[in-house]
């Protein structure tokens, strides 16, 4: 049985993939929605990782921040590419500046080109090895 946090991540990923199917040029509402859904998906992803790590017996005190979760998840092979996840964390942190259209478009481009694939790889890894 998958936890609520894992299921929330799967739903967030499905929502992100749905909006990412839209082609540019984007209107402001679509652009804002894409950035917001990226942020939500990232949040749900790291919380799902934390949930699976705790379920597998890793100490909660080692899992306080997204960065700590990413680093431990990489060490135990839940993630294949630590730097990509750290880049995704930085993009999530940049969401606060997404009123700047260049930052927003950068987040959207990275989401489309690499972060969705990254999220899908996490989903597969959880389903295959961390349930």
Regions found by a protein language model. Give the residues of each.
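Solvent-exposed interaction patches of small proteins and small membrane subunits
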Residues: 1-131
């Amino acid at each position: 049985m998958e936890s609520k946090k894992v299921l929330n991540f799967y739903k967030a990923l499905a929502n992100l993939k749905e909006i990412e199917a839209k082609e540019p040029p984007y209107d402001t509402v679509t652009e804002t929605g894409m950035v917001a859904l990226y942020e939500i998906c990232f949040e749900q992803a790291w919380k799902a990782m934390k949930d699976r790590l705790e379920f597998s017996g890793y100490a909660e005190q080692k899992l306080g921040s997204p960065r700590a979760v990413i680093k431990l998840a990489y060490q135990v092979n839940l993630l294949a590419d630590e730097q990509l996840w750290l880049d995704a964390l930085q993009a999530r942190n940049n969401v606060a500046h997404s009123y700047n259209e260049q930052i927003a478009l950068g987040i959207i481009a990275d989401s489309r080109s690499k972060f969705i694939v990254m999220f899908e790889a996490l989903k597969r890894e959880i389903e295959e090895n961390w349930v």
